[in-house]
Amino acid sequence: MSSKLRVGVAGPVGSGKTALVETLCLSLKKNYEIAIVTNDIFTKEDANFLINKKVLEEGRIIGVETGGCPHTAIREDCSLNKNAVLDLENKYNPLDFVFVESGGDNLASSFSPELVDLSIYVIDVSAGDKIPRKGGPGITRSDLLLINKIDLADKVGADLNIMKSDTEFMRKGKPWFFTNLSIGIGVEEITQFLESHIPNNRN
């Protein structure tokens, strides 16, 4: 028993990871079976937020308390997350998507291939237009990169044209989108990206 697609969502604190998971679940749940695993170091804050927002029924959302480095829990020792995913897959078989949201981390964050099938990395404009050219696995190797909160560009003095140029250089043809998740900009493109990666046959 497994899900068709395990999707990792990573990025710095406050970039919009939970907002992305919320938005995607609301967009996809009419047509797909979905579950969520969230990561926090000492709490289950993100899981409780999604439960309170009624993004999915409560049983489909598991909060993992990693107790340490967010990166370790999704890469070097992903056993807590892997067990949570397996629990959901056994309980709600069949599932189309399982989203695994990492705790906030730096640009070196990446998921173990044992845990997810593809990864989405979220950065936001408020961190400055230099972020894409700083590189790191999240920028260069994620399956999809999102540059969120584009509405804040003028307020923080970020140049979206510079971010676009640097991102295209760093990504080397890999997909990426500008987004403003608070009003739905980019959601349709992300949804189509995910749907295009669903295997034809369940494992």
Swiss-Prot record:
One of its GO terms (molecular function) is GTPase activity. GO terms for cellular component: cytoplasm. Facilitates the functional incorporation of the urease nickel metallocenter. This process requires GTP hydrolysis, probably effectuated by UreG. GO terms for biological process: urea catabolic process. Pfam families: cobW (PF02492). SUPFAM superfamilies: P-loop containing nucleoside triphosphate hydrolases. Transmembrane segments: none annotated. This is Urease accessory protein UreG. It is found in: Cytoplasm. Homodimer. UreD, UreF and UreG form a complex that acts as a GTP-hydrolysis-dependent molecular chaperone, activating the urease apoprotein by helping to assemble the nickel containing metallocenter of UreC. The UreE protein probably delivers the nickel. HAMAP family: UreG. PANTHER family: UREASE ACCESSORY PROTEIN G. Belongs to the SIMIBI class G3E GTPase family. UreG subfamily. Keywords: Chaperone, Cytoplasm, GTP-binding, Nickel insertion, Nucleotide-binding. It comes from Prochlorococcus marinus (strain MIT 9301).
